Amino acid sequence: MDCSICTTMPSILRPPRNTICGSCYEGARTTIALLKKLEGSKEDRHDKSNHNSTINNGSSISSSPLFSCEPQPLEKVIKWMKNMKETEEEQKKRIVFLSSFVSGFKEQLHADILLKPGDDGPPIPAHRALLASKSEIFKNILDSDGCKTAPEYAITLQELNSEQLQALLEFLYTGTLASDKLEKNVYALFIAADKYMIHYLQELCEQYMLSSLDISSVLNVLDVSDLGSSKTLKEACVGFVVRNMDDVVFSDKYEPFSQKNQHLCVEITRAFLMETRSKRRD
């Protein structure tokens, strides 16, 4: 079929030269649908903002036509894509600007507190303001009278060794962590993130553990999830064990795990029996 969009030589098309093939048609529909979906989510947030403004100010803000969910022409998609490109470039500049603070950590510029690992490793200089802004628990610790009056004050994180503490601080300063460091320290970082209420790090560790869950790791992850407060992670692990009962229970890791975590074994047994009962009913 003649297509005025994907052909490389539009001059050879037969009149009226405005037909498109099925692939281009579906592509255009999908693109416009995506734009409407994104603008719909923006409109929801905009409406919530208007509602809050009405409550606080006694007046409402009219809805912007930019967020209209009415059918839009394909040409608006091009404008949206250009705006997204500009937004992406702006975000890159912002990341570069914010990452300059990392040099303060690496070069120990004007550090005003020490963090000590639990393995008697050397203390690591850090900045109180950053710790307090990233963790409500750190903020409460730093607000204590003893910590305020002692510039050389050191906080000991007993649950982390030197390498794990370094990884934690690297994440706090940069908002990211190399995949090899995350893989090696994910369990310790998850527990620390839960303890010190560093929610973004906790979510990152949880997503990594869920994405890499397998026979060899599920018991370790289940153990860690029980120490933390992630119900989602714990339920995912129990469900994985139930679906792979033979492989997990007869593995070398299960006996020491069962001796250490009898309550988790009870949960696994109950979940397995409920799953078996459900299958029998079906």
From Swiss-Prot:
GO biological process, one term: protein ubiquitination
SUPFAM superfamilies: POZ domain
UniProt remark on domains: The BTB/POZ domain mediates the interaction with some component of ubiquitin ligase complexes.
Protein name from the UniProt record: BTB/POZ domain-containing protein At3g56230
Function: May act as a substrate-specific adapter of an E3 ubiquitin-protein ligase complex (CUL3-RBX1-BTB) which mediates the ubiquitination and subsequent proteasomal degradation of target proteins.
Key word Aminoacyl-tRNA synthetase present: no
Organism: Arabidopsis thaliana (Mouse-ear cress)
Domain of life according to the entry: Eukaryota
Metabolic or biological pathway, per its Swiss-Prot or TrEMBL entry: Protein modification; protein ubiquitination
InterPro entries reported in the protein's UniProt record: At1g01640-like, BTB/POZ_dom, SKP1/BTB/POZ_sf
Keywords in alphabetical order: Ubl conjugation pathway
Residues covered by the BTB domain: 111-181
Record field: compositional bias (Basic and acidic residues): 40-50
Pfam families, per database record: BTB
Renumbered residue ranges of the record's region Disordered: 40-66
Comp. bias regions, Low complexity: 51-64
